[in-house]
Amino acid sequence: VGVVGVNGAGKTTVLNLLRGEVEPTGGRVRRGKTVKVATLSQETRELDAVAGMRVVEAVADIAQVVVAGGKEITAQQMTERMGFTRERAHTRVKEISGGERRRLQLMRLLMSQPNVLLLDEPTNDLDTDTLAAMEDLLDSFAGTLVVVSHDRYLLERVTDHQVALLGDGTLRALPGGVEQYLQMRRGAAVGSSGGAAGGAGEGAA
């Protein structure tokens, strides 16, 4: 499921509800007993605990081998799939770039084998090649994905359904995908007294 909406509409709050960090002011959230949630946040400070490890060690620290798309993937193979050369995979975490830290976050999450994966702006700080590798990995993810992103291509590639948060506490299904949401935004901009220049593309997610 892809989640879109302007900044401040409540996208991150929805993710926090799903992972149990906040409670709803009305209604309730029901979670299955077998649900295992993992979240790719926009914060990389969680990697400070493994700063002294090498990248491949930080991945293997979660699991040595996982099954993805029906195939076994080792920690070393996971780093290669996410664009780390053998040399970079043996670089200490404290020495890698911001984009590499994001990739490491995702690899550690996937090695924990969740069945629900929440992604909050997962493409931040990633180059084109890494984006392609990440999309391939997410395509093979067997569980449920909930993705908040400004990247329209990513949403259309890795999610089957999109919904819009309208900023007033309501949620609308988008059978027409992200394009339907953009049309809604354009209609709102035209209908507003100020004209809202540039509003059509603001906060695609």
Can you say where each PLM-predicted feature lies in the sequence?
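ABC ATP-binding cassette signature C-motif
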Residues: 1-205
